[in-house]
């Protein structure tokens, strides 16, 4: 099985940041990306398990994968 988190277009390390900082950093990073590019987000704030999927729905980005069983959490989104 292939790891969906390999070879993202951009990576954002949000470890150590607490709500609302991770989502603010994601938003800032996504603004600088082209439609269709992927972003790997690495975080350790439990609030991201709710906030990142919600951000993707609200901003119409696609959440391609998420791994939240252990720290650090990983999310892969595609800019919509």
From Swiss-Prot:
Keywords: Cytoplasm, tRNA processing. GO terms for molecular function: sulfur carrier activity. Pathway: tRNA modification. GO terms for cellular component: cytoplasm. Sulfur carrier protein involved in sulfur trafficking in the cell. Part of a sulfur-relay system required for 2-thiolation during synthesis of 2-thiouridine of the modified wobble base 5-methylaminomethyl-2-thiouridine (mnm(5)s(2)U) in tRNA. Interacts with IscS and stimulates its cysteine desulfurase activity. Accepts an activated sulfur from IscS, which is then transferred to TusD, and thus determines the direction of sulfur flow from IscS to 2-thiouridine formation. Also appears to be involved in sulfur transfer for the biosynthesis of molybdopterin. Interacts with IscS. This is Sulfur carrier protein TusA. The gene is tusA.
